[in-house]
Amino acid sequence: MADLIPLAQARCVPRKGSDHKLGEARLAELLPQVPGWELSEGGQALLRTFRFKNYYATMAFVNALAWIAHHEDHHPDLGVHYDRAVVRFSTHDVGGLSENDFICAAKTSALTEQLP
């Protein structure tokens, strides 16, 4: 289970079916582990806006995030702008949020500590 190790070090696993959809209690446990992220769409998605100095920094972040998404086989919806990127995670195969969304949110947040 992802909470035995830090979320940013966990790996995504395939999750299909509503039995993998997180309930309110588990969401309340995991949300504090991804500071800056918020529940959206009635708890069906995780959302965060990342701000950057310029377009180059924004694109560096987006490209690094694309590598993580490919590696974890879990892909966010992105809104890319000059000085910000809006990142939204949800697991369509479970009809809401799964632990994979929190794992990828933590990995995404960790990127900002490594980029210029």
Curated annotation (Swiss-Prot):
InterPro entries cross-referenced by the UniProt entry: PCD_sf, Pterin_deHydtase
Any one GO molecular-function label of the UniProt entry: 4-alpha-hydroxytetrahydrobiopterin dehydratase activity
Superkingdom of origin: Bacteria
One GO process term, biological-process aspect: tetrahydrobiopterin biosynthetic process
Name of a matching Pfam family: Pterin_4a
Keyword Lyase: yes
HAMAP family: Pterin_4_alpha
Protein name, as recorded: Putative pterin-4-alpha-carbinolamine dehydratase
